[in-house]
Amino acid sequence: MAKHVVFDEESRRALERGVNSLADAVRITLGPKGRNVVLEKKFGAPQIINDGVTIAKEVELEDPLENAGAQLMREVASKTNDVAGDGTTTATVLAQALIREGLKNVAAGANPVALRKGIDKTIDALVKEIEAKSKPVAGDAIAQVATISAGNDTEVGQMIAQAMDKVGKDGVITVEESKSLATEMEIVEGMQIDRGYISPYFVTDAERMVAEIENARLLIVNKKISSLQDLVGILEQVARAGQPLLIIAEDLEGEALATLVVNKLRGVLNVVAIKAPGFGERRQAMLQDIAVLTGGQVISEDVGLTLDKVDLEMLGTARKVTISKDNTTIVSEAANAGDVGKRVEQLRRQLDETDSEYDKEKLQERIAKLAGGVAVIKVGAATETELKDRKLRIEDALNATKAAVAEGIVPGGGTTLIHLTKTIESVKAQLKDEEKVGADLVGIALEAPLTQIADNAGKEGAVVVEKVRDADFSYGYNAMTDTYEDMIAAGVVDPAKVVRSGLQNAGSIAGMVLTTEALVVDKPEPAGAAAPDMGGMGGMGGMGGMGGMGGMGGMGMM
């Protein structure tokens, strides 16, 4: 395909137009009084949204040169979302301001490479300042962070704070769509496995169709069990001990399953069997997790253990096990806490070493199941449009809360960025010549988020910025109540990680745009060029005479 190549000022201006098209659509959502954006969908009702990254992903421009600029801005929002889970609109506003001011200087003859160096060095210094000013998050601050990110929804803020308190910082909190109108939370204590009973004959509560056993023994086997002979020895020992038994195996079939079911129905043995979770190497690892949690051993031929050699000491113990058709929840004894802690540390090290997003997600899940538990927030709303918007807000709030726990909090509402402008002068003292102009660009860009928040609230942004700049570090403008106050005391806080990653990603993309000298894009195809003229095909109408082919029936030579 032919390419369109543009150079110098023309390439940078095309990028800027694309940047502005996307950023102008995103920035109107910033702050507590930000507006909504309606996204047209090819199928179904339009989506009303207030989430920066979702809007950014929908913008596709007709002009390929401008679209390249829009794609770069989309990268700012996506990268910030990946790292911090929130703050995408702030990052977009910062990047737009840096690019706008930077291109003015490049057009006036400034050296783009020196500008980029100045921007990078200044942002590095500001990141250190953010780290120094951040405060650890505790108590009510968790609910405050979640409330701000959920668009000042106090109910959601309290719910997320409660979930974090229940499952701990290693726990997993998931967001699902509810079947009702209310938004509610469900806490699953213990380890939950996505496997249910092998046979419905194992249930102990026929009304709820679940099997519940207490003070149970666990036989954890990394193989398929089909022969009853393999199980006889251990079943006799468990029966003598008078305890219920949960068997976790690759599969259970044939006479082994039939005998267990018969013994269960006759009341000889209280037993339930489930299939092992996961596949391949991950199955082996998850069985080991269960063994550590319950203080048992995995019976595997890989380590020289076979079923005929198993005794009670090798079985795990659980305070309570609940098995439904699809899930099993194991609540372990507190005595195994030391071993569980060591296993969690081992998994954390694996988490730090892996690059795969999928592996990271699975490891995080395993850590949560071992260390804390799982909380599920079920989002309800009157219409599907409201449900989607609410779900996105809750996901943002959840991500912001995790970011706050990771790196602490700073004053919110654009306040921290304004007060960081005071450190620009000390940074400039260490820079050379035109690099200082890069530092000034960052100083101007830092004002953009608060200006936009004030504009969206119907105030004069420039006036608000000057008022906040002259005050203490935690003093800022609360757009929700239209007052100037101590933002941390008022509960208007941002996770330091969100502010940091937004600033870094904005600086990165701005530096790339400023140092662009050429732009290469696909040439749009002329309208109608792809479809050749089919008019000449009209003569095919004469094919009607083929009806005479019926005479071919005489070919029956066989």
Curated annotation (Swiss-Prot):
Keyword Lipid metabolism found: no
Residues making up the signal peptide according to the UniProt record: none
Catalytic activity: ATP + H2O + a folded polypeptide = ADP + phosphate + an unfolded polypeptide
InterPro entries attached to this UniProt entry: Cpn60/GroEL, Cpn60/GroEL/TCP-1, GroEL-like_apical_dom_sf, GROEL-like_equatorial_sf, TCP-1-like_intermed_sf
Positions of ATP binding: T29, L30, G31, P32, D86, G87, T88, T89, T90, G413, D494
Localization annotation: Cytoplasm
A GO cellular component annotation in the UniProt record: cytoplasm
The protein's enzyme class: isomerase
GO biological process, one term: protein refolding
SUPFAM superfamilies: GroEL apical domain-like (SSF52029), GroEL equatorial domain-like (SSF48592)
TM ranges: none
EC number, as in UniProt: 5.6.1.7
Subunit structure: Forms a cylinder of 14 subunits composed of two heptameric rings stacked back-to-back. Interacts with the co-chaperonin GroES.
NCBIfam families xref list: GroEL (TIGR02348), PRK00013.1 (NF000592), PRK12849.1 (NF009487), PRK12850.1 (NF009488), PRK12851.1 (NF009489)
Name this protein carries in UniProt: Chaperonin GroEL 1
Encoding gene per record: groEL1
